[in-house]
Amino acid sequence: MTQKLHIKTWGCQMNEYDSSKMADLLQSTHGLELTEEAEQADVLLLNTCSIREKAQEKVFHQLGRWKELKKKNPNLVIGVGGCVASQEGEHIRERAPYVDIIFGPQTLHRLPEMINQIRAGEKAVLDISFPEIEKFDRLPEPKAEGPTAFVSIMEGCNKYCTYCVVPYTRGEEVSRPLDDVLFEIAQLAEQGVREVNLLGQNVNAYRGPTHDGGICSFAELLRLVAAIDGIDRLRFTTSNPIEFTDDIIDVYRDTPELVSFLHLPVQAGSDRILTMMKRGHTAIEYKSIIRKLRAVRPNIQISSDFIVGFPGETNEEFEQTMNLIQQVNFDMSFSFVYSARPGTPAADMPDDVTEEEKKQRLYILQQRINNQAAQFSRAMLGTEQRVLVEGPSKKDIMELTGRTENNRIVNFAGTPDMIGKFVDIKITDVFTNSLRGDVVRTEDQMGLRVVQSPQAVINRTRKEDELGVGRFGG
């Protein structure tokens, strides 16, 4: 009888990527099939996030539910991974002794051995070490699920913003070798992927080793990925303003595959608060990046992250954030009230903004950005938009749905052969959460750029050096 795996994932896109790799890995090593029902599972994995408030309590609340399942099935294997596991591994073991496996973001590739250890009789396994980039060398080949895919290109962060736990939970910045990244993307392109989203906690800090001993910059990587035939839409998440160099802006000038939509976190509009956060840039420097981007891509839309109610933030400083929002004209945001993260420098600062004031500021900020987003959507009425078709519409299975470059959902009447391809749509209706339109052009009428076939990348000879690290030769 086939054994089942249930994974519950919280947090960022990197966690979503990690969870998909766990599923692929355990399917290849143990034949575990994914199930949406925890009650059916033989292995339960919780992939955690420590960014949000009360992250630890949320974990223990979920584990309490799974404890009841373990009482009914003593052979059930329970594992906790992700950033809370990395930060609170020993505490989880003490407070939830029924948890079998505790692993960090950098040790998920060791899950097969950990499960084997538990099934061989070991009481518990804890591995929250930071073996750099080893996990990518131990994961199975990627499997495409639809026309879009995430590809992790680097891990960790060296910036140590005062409010953030990422450097402590995912370690310092480590970039994947260039050829490993290109090989994975070429494999996905061979399977029909058309849009790739490059992932990293500080993605534009990518400095990937090349097979000849050199270093590939993030800007160079963007051009190389965009040149792979079939990859006709390219995104990246999450970037840092202090790493947003002019060579990246130049890619926006001459690389049509790179979308006219950018997520660039700023967190606040007050220079004093930015200094307290140790962000490493001013509001003017942030606006300078946006100005340069719009000089080469006038239609680019920007989303961002904001923290309101940071320790010591005054009403005047919050207004500076609101002024920045208006000046940049953000299309979207991930915005949150400040809450202290244990072990971070900001946790030692007086949290002197009341919860009521934080919530009020958050409401004001989100209303402003929602209004700006609605204006962007209304401006799309009557325009032609290139849409990547994802499948049948959730609203009407007789119609199709897809996304624009700026992440708007578009529903339209189409044919099944359009799924997984691009179509140009004239927008006829604008709704709160979606758009509607008519097909004006199919992919075979677009003349998309053709540079290098995925097979040409895959066919490069993969070799290993004396340390067993894979590389590509000529």
UniProtKB/Swiss-Prot annotation:
Transmembrane segments: none annotated. [4Fe-4S] cluster 2 binds at residues 157, 161, 164. [4Fe-4S] cluster 1 binds at residues 12, 49, 83. GO terms for molecular function: 4 iron, 4 sulfur cluster binding; metal ion binding; N6-isopentenyladenosine methylthiotransferase activity. GO terms for cellular component: cytosol. Residues 3-120 form the MTTase N-terminal domain. It comes from the Bacteria. Signal peptide: none annotated. This is tRNA-2-methylthio-N(6)-dimethylallyladenosine synthase.
